[in-house]
A protein has these predicted regions:
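A polyanion-binding, active-site-adjacent surface
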Residues: 1-156
Length: 156
């Protein structure tokens, strides 16, 4: 099990769908090769992990790294409830699975766009980026991630 880290009312909630294999082994989200890249991403927008609430919807990785439709509905409910409890100022949706669960849209459709995520306590502005592991495997996607991340600094 990989539990959330951080405090309520953080500047940013970083939300993945579920832990990666390295995360489950280490008991912390965004470890392994993806960890240093996430740290660099946060530094680029003026934050560090301690400024953020970092969580995943599922505390364990599903078999095969995918969930079925029946689980997706429950994870969507958990998403909105978790965001309402965490009360972040902004939300960073990490990975195509997370975005699909949150909005039903593919990552390509929302790159460089500010999203509004409705939840039990209102709504929060969000952006989506590819998972850092994907950005390491496909560096050409880093520019699109940066286009989205710049929106988080808007109005700061």
């Amino acid at each position: 099990r990989v539990l959330p880290q951080g405090t309520q009312d953080s500047a940013l909630m970083v939300l993945a769908a579920w832990p990666e294999v390295d995360d489950q082994r280490d008991g912390t989200l965004f470890t392994g090769p993806a960890g240093p890249l996430l740290d660099a991403i946060l530094r680029a927008i003026g934050l560090k992990r301690d400024d953020c609430y970092i969580a995943s919807l599922a505390v364990t990785r599903p078999a095969g790294g995918r969930c079925d439709e029946s689980d997706a509905a429950e994870l969507d409910r958990l998403l909105r409830h978790h965001v309402a409890l965490a009360r972040p100022q902004r939300l960073l949706l990490v990975g195509s699975d997370m975005l699909r669960l949150a909005t039903g849209r593919p990552l390509a459709d929302v790159r460089g766009k500010l999203l509004d995520l409705n939840h039990d306590g209102g709504k929060v502005e969000a952006v989506a980026i590819a998972h850092p592991a994907m950005l390491l495997a496909r560096p050409a996607h880093k520019a699109a991630a940066w286009d989205s991340l710049k929106l988080l600094n808007r109005g700061r």
